């Protein structure tokens, strides 16, 4: 009821959230209540999916204005970290598996190059407005050897990159830009997997089965390059949302959400 009846009542969505005469027949049929494996999905009384496969024909139209929305500035030489001041420590975004909250770590500059658990995170303004690029550090993605890219980055949906190699980060950025937006995994100069999202850089125009297959390939590729997160692109998508504690990054730089201030990468001791 917490996921069905209660929300429907809270938002006064009459006819939703329950199984009774007069209610819309939006139903799930599950194998059992422990594993909660979904076998059938009904929408308005019609069978919509069986064992994870969507059954309805899919058609859709979208305006030309939501195409060609990725306009990147020059990247060369702009995805490196600023040089640290003497005796400075770096503000590092620490992510947690399956959570959108982050922690702010302070790591001495001398320890950064020696750590294989840190990666660069960059936000690149992609709407052709100001050409901003901000670069920081992130911990929690695992021991990456390559780069991840995504144009899904709440709420401004700029391009976000996480990686350990500058050339791989640039290639990942070019890959999603050429597709009109999307997700990509790159390592050692090769694109291992990608999913084009040409509708505003946020949505695919492919059928659900194709999107599901490509999304699974992305996750497998991310694991192959050392990513330890179960949902890396979901985690990435919230790193640029500067309203959730503690530390975020936008195209204007790092944001200390507890103070609602833009802060430098390097903090003096």
Tell me the role of every PLM-derived stretch.
Residues 1-269:
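Active-site microenvironment of metallo-dependent hydrolases
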């Amino acid at each position: 009821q917490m996921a069905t009846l209660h929300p429907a009542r809270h938002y006064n969505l009459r006819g939703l959230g329950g199984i009774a005469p007069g209610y819309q027949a939006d139903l799930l049929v599950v194998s059992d209540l422990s594993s909660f494996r979904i076998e059938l999905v009904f929408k308005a009384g019609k069978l919509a999916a069986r064992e994870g496969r969507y059954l309805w024909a899919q058609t859709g139209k979208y305006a030309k204005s939501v195409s060609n929305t990725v306009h990147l500035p020059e990247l060369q030489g702009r995805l490196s970290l600023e040089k640290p001041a003497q005796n400075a420590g770096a503000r590092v975004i620490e992510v947690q598996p399956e959570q959108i909250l982050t922690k702010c770590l302070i790591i001495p500059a001398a320890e950064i190059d020696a750590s294989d658990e840190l990666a660069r995170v960059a936000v690149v303004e992609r709407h052709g407005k100001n050409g901003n690029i901000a670069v920081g550090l992130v911990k929690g993605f695992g021991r990456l050897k390559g780069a991840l890219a995504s144009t899904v980055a709440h709420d401004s949906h700029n391009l976000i990159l996480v990686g350990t190699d500058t050339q791989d980060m640039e290639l990942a950025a070019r890959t999603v830009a050429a597709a009109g937006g999307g997700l990509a995994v790159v390592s050692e100069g090769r694109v291992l997997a990608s999913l084009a999202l040409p509708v505003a850089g946020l949505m695919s125009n492919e059928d659900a089965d194709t999107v599901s297959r490509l999304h699974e390939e992305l996750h497998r590729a991310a694991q192959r390059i050392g990513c330890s997160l179960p949902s890396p692109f979901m985690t990435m998508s919230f790193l640029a949302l500067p309203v959730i504690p503690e530390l975020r990054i936008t195209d204007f730089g790092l944001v200390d959400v507890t103070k609602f201030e833009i802060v430098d990468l390097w903090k003096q001791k």
